[in-house]
Amino acid sequence: YDEFVSALSKHISVIRTEAGCEFIDIYRDTQKENVVNVWEIWSDRPSWDAHMVNENSKAWQSVAKDLVFGETITVMDQLP
C-alpha cells in the first residue's frame, strides 16, 4: 500500500503539469482498507483522452500492474 501511494504521488505530480488537467488528488478510503481513490478533473474529454495514452501514463501502467489489484474508472460529465 505505502509503495503504491508513494509511486502514485510521484506520477500525479507529473499529471498536474499536463495540458487540460485542472485537478487531481489521492484519497484514502476510510471504509475499505488499502483502497485509494484518485479524483481528476480535466478541462475537456480530448485532454483526458490524450493523457490516457501519453508516455507518462504508459510508464505508470507498467509500474501499477504489480501494485494494483482492481481498478474502476468512471467518466462523468458535469450537469449544467
Can you annotate each of these PLM segments?
Residues 1-4:
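Short, surface-exposed ligand-recognition loops at beta-strand->loop->(often short) alpha-helix junctions
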Residues 10, 14-22, 41-75:
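An amphipathic, aromatic/His-enriched active-site/gating alpha helix that lines ligand/cofactor pockets
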Residues 23-26, 38:
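A structural signal for the hydrophobic beta-strands that form the central parallel beta-sheet
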Residues 27-31:
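Short beta-strand micro-motifs enriched in acidic
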Residues 34-36:
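Residues on conserved beta-strands of the protein kinase catalytic domain
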Residues 76-80:
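Short hydrophobic/aromatic patches at helix-to-coil boundaries
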